[in-house]
Amino acid sequence: MFIDQVKIYVKGGDGGNGMVAYRREKYVPKGGPAGGDGGKGADVVFIVEEGLRTLMDFRYQRHFKADRGQHGMSKGQHGRKSEDLLVKVPPGTVVKDEKTGQILADLVTHGQTAVIAKGGRGGRGNSRFATATNPAPEIAENGEPGQERDVILELKVLADVGLVGFPSVGKSTLLSVVSSARPKIAEYHFTTIVPNLGVVETGDNRSFVMADLPGLIEGAHAGVGLGHQFLRHIERTRVIVHVIDMSGLEGRDPYEDYVTINNELKEYNLRLTERPQVVVANKMDMPDAEENLQAFKEKVGDEVKIFPISAVTKQGVRDLLFEVANLIETTPEFPIHEVVDESDTSVMYKFETEGVKFDITRESDGTFVISGYDIEKTFKMTDFSRDESVRRFARQMRGMGIDEALRARGAKDGDIVKILEYEFEFID
């Protein structure tokens, strides 16, 4: 089975907790704080493994959670950073954020890496909070939570040439005679439902990878007939070979097929029209093919170069392969999105918080609910088992303007305020 799209969950490791500790050595009066910081949580890193060809492995494991950092220790010892969690993906994998649709990484070359979920930083130990007025603080931070998200993995086949056209126009047959690939060939539509790859060698010692892509139908750009799953593979090809059935045995008009397929490519991704396209008139060994070809040429004009072939008898195939090889040599690769810098094989996704720092809503029972990335992160990093940490959290809330915002919403002494799953009383 060929798996070309899958949804998975990734979570960076939480940072280790900071420690509250003090020096107790002999001959060290008033030893002072000695709590170490927690270690950084591990990142979830995707790495390209050239030996992989599908996303099949993700059918069986869809949750990837990196290890948290080691907790801080006494005597000022910091916790150890956890080893990053490496997730192997095949070349041609595009990683998208499931919620926003943003492309996080486009992984194409062996060994290329991308950080998909960052681990949290370690919490600070009490030695970090010592001041002239508070030389022995009873306060330490919990580790920062690691980033978590659902991501969509899409595999777009890496091929120099893509064969496109309606079902049963002879794409699989053509691939089978020009390469050692053995795609399934039968007398019914959609025999090919997954891409087939073959290495083509020309007579002058040139070679390229050709992909037999599943047949397209009208409305494919809108998802009709699994159109989105088929069209995504064309985005990586450098040259498009448009195969048209000139026999007319299917009852379709070759020119209408030509126009329909090109419209589908344009509607799906306008940039596909920038790629060189070779028009192949197939099944020229059939009785009415020559007459249909002449009518087709009259409609498309002299600007479109047409290669009449018969994939079955191999008539015209040699000239076609030479033309395709020439186009590949003069055509650059087309990235699927704008690339800022390709000088490094590593990609770092920089996470930026979105939206407001906090939001306040009120439930039907009068409880005030505070939410937002910043306040929830601050809450999770607070050690509520220590009074000094609780007082610090209260100061942080005031500094963020939450107290003032609660008063503006009508909060009074004794009202219940909720953050995540925890409730406490509002004191004015």
UniProtKB/Swiss-Prot annotation:
One of its GO terms (molecular function) is GTPase activity. Its EC number is 3.6.5.-. Keywords: Cytoplasm, GTP-binding, Hydrolase, Magnesium, Metal-binding, Nucleotide-binding. It is found in: Cytoplasm. Residues 159-329 form the OBG-type G domain. Residues 1-158 form the Obg domain. Its cofactor is Mg(2+). One of its GO terms (cellular component) is cytoplasm. It is an enzyme of class 3 (hydrolase). InterPro entries: G_OBG, GTP-bd, GTP-bd_Obg/CgtA, GTP-bd_prot_GTP1/OBG_C_sf, GTP1-OBG_CS, GTP1_OBG_dom, GTP1_OBG_dom_sf, OBG_GTPase. An essential GTPase which binds GTP, GDP and possibly (p)ppGpp with moderate affinity, with high nucleotide exchange rates and a fairly low GTP hydrolysis rate. Plays a role in control of the cell cycle, stress response, ribosome biogenesis and in those bacteria that undergo differentiation, in morphogenesis control. Monomer. This is GTPase Obg. It comes from Bacillus anthracis. The lineage of its organism: Bacteria, Bacillati, Bacillota, Bacilli, Bacillales.
